[in-house]
Each structure stands twice: as C-alpha cells, then as structure tokens.
UniProtKB/Swiss-Prot annotation:
Topology in the lipid bilayer: Multi-pass membrane protein
Keywords from the UniProt entry: Cell membrane, Heme biosynthesis, Membrane, Transferase, Transmembrane, Transmembrane helix
Primary location class: membrane
EC top class, as a word: transferase
Official protein name in the record: Protoheme IX farnesyltransferase
Gene behind the chain: ctaB
GO biological-process terms attached to the record: heme O biosynthetic process
GO cellular component: plasma membrane
Family annotation (NCBIfam families): cyoE_ctaB, PRK04375.1-2
Annotated metabolic or biological route of this protein: Porphyrin-containing compound metabolism; heme O biosynthesis; heme O from protoheme: step 1/1
GO MF term set: protoheme IX farnesyltransferase activity
Xref: PANTHER family: 4-HYDROXYBENZOATE SOLANESYLTRANSFERASE, PROTOHEME IX FARNESYLTRANSFERASE, MITOCHONDRIAL
C-alpha cells in the first residue's frame, strides 16, 4: 500500500512537471543565460539563480496554461493526446490553478528580488504566449507561429534586463534571432504532423498553403535567420570567432532547408527540426563564449 502511494505521488509530480513543457523550458533558460552573460555589468550569482528560476517558472506557467486551453485539440492529435490533461491524469482545473499560481509567483519574485523591468518583461512574455498566441492566433491564422514566436524570444531580453535594469537594442538583437528561428523550426515539425493539425482544425501554414510553399518559406526564413545571427558581432568581445561559428552553424541550417525542398520526405524534415534545436543551443553557446573573459 505504501509503495503504491509513493508511485502515485511520483506519477503525479511527473505529470505536473510535464505540464511545464520542460524541453522548451531548458531552451528558454539557456537563451536567458546568454542574455545575462552578454549584457554589460555583473550580477550576484544568487540573484542570477533566482532570476533563472523565475524565468523557468514563467515559461512553465505559460506552458501549463497552454495545455489547459488546448486540451480539446490535444485529445485529437497523436502527438499530444498522451499529455497529462487529455489523458485524464491531471484535471483541467488543477492544471489551470497550477499554471496561474507559478506564473504569478515568478513575476512577483522577479519584481521583489531582482528588478521591475525584468518582471514586467517576464509578465509580457507569459501573457503574450497565453493570450496572443494560444487563445487568439493559434486557431485563427497560418501566421500563428510567425507572430506568436515573439513570446519565446523574450528570455534573452529578460536576461539582459536582469543585469542592467534596462532594455537595449543589443538585447533585442538576441530577441530577433529567436523570432526568425521559430517559423522554420516549427514548420519543419508541422510538415510531418499535417494530419494531426488538419484533424484538430489548426490552420498551420502547411495545412493552409500546402507543403511546397511551406518549404519555400522555411528556406526564406532560414536565410533571414542566418543573416540576423551575424548581428551580435556588432557588440560581442570576440566578434571574429563568433562570426565564424554563426556562419558555420548557419550554413548547415540552410543546407537542411534546401534538403527538405529537394527530398520532400519525412526524414529530411525530421532532421531539420532536430538540427534547429541543436543550432539554437550552439549559437547561444557561442554568444556566451564570446561574452566572457577566457583569458
């Protein structure tokens, strides 16, 4: 009996953890770290840790509320029907309460412990994802990911504000990189999940305009992304090294975009989706390395 209780508790904890969309949360935190490291000045390590926890909780909050709102369409799609709410492991009410609670806490703690500007930016990012992307855009327009992608681009700007207590065009350069990265990243996934999105009546770009046009736009956004990725060289300490890394990673990104146009198959699209994640980690790791004093 005791063992069963422990298993049930562990299962419940894991399900609430899944509500936070941890894979997205890891990327959010990493890009926030890049914003903090690239910003001029310094911050106490404890405050930096508090800030990152708040950013992670804010991201998780948006993810949980997104799952609460999308529980009807999640039930219709193979990719999402096993999520905690549609599978019945977590009630919709509990998920909403959980998401709202950690979201409010993350913004409140950020405001009290760090500064108001970073707290306001965190709140804007959470609310944008919930109200602009999830509730307004996702089910209404094929531009859902293009516009809604702005919500996922806030973390480096927040990280910058954590250190400087201000916003800067340099922080928004990092924002722009993620903004340009989001469409090719998600469209590569949606090409392989067209039936799911059609069944759930989600007007993804490929569902509305077809796979051929989607692949062309993936290439267009990939080129724009690579060009945008060069901009941090304007303010990073080791600009030549960064440019080399950005061009190297960007050429591979464009190669994948060209490959899916030529091959038009599931495997190439899956490879591009996977690489796009590695690419963003690689690019922001390069930003971090070129912002710190190694010697």
């Amino acid at each position: 009996m005791h063992a069963n209780t422990l298993l049930n508790v562990e299962s419940t904890v894991l399900d609430f953890w899944r509500l936070l969309k941890p894979r997205i949360m890891y990327l959010v935190v990493f890009t926030a770290v890049a914003g903090m490291v690239a910003a001029p000045g310094s911050i106490h390590p404890f405050l930096a840790l508090i800030s990152l926890i708040c950013i992670a909780l804010g991201s998780g909050s948006a993810g949980a509320i997104n799952m609460w709102y999308d529980r009807d369409i999640d039930l219709l799609m193979k990719r999402t029907k096993a999520r905690p709410i549609p599978s019945g492991r977590v009630s919709a009410e509990s998920a909403l309460e959980f998401g709202v609670t950690i979201g409010v806490l993350s913004v409140f703690i950020m405001a009290i412990a760090v500064n108001y500007i970073s707290a306001i930016l965190l709140a804007i990012g959470i609310l944008f994802y919930i109200f602009i992307y999830t509730i307004w855009l996702k089910r209404r327009t094929p531009q859902n990911i293009v516009i809604g992608g702005a919500s996922g681009a806030f973390p480096p700007v927040i990280g910058w504000a954590v250190v400087t207590d201000s916003v800067s065009w340099r922080g928004f350069v990092l924002f722009l990189i993620i903004f340009m990265w989001t469409p090719p990243h998600f469209w590569a996934l949606s090409l392989n999940k067209s039936e799911d999105y059609e069944k759930a009546s989600v007007p993804m770009f490929n569902v509305v305009y077809g796979p051929e046009k989607t692949r062309k736009y993936i290439l267009v956004y990939s080129v724009l992304l690579v060009l945008t990725s060069l901009l941090p060289a304007l303010f990073l300490k080791r600009a030549p090294f960064y440019l080399g890394m950005a061009i190297f990673g960007g050429c591979i990104f464009i190669w994948h975009a060209v490959s899916i146009m030529k091959l038009k198959d599931h495997s190439s699209q899956k490879r591009m989706f996977s690489y796009s994640i590695s690419y963003l980690f690689f690019l922001f790791a390069s930003i971090i390395l070129c912002s710190i004093d190694l010697f």
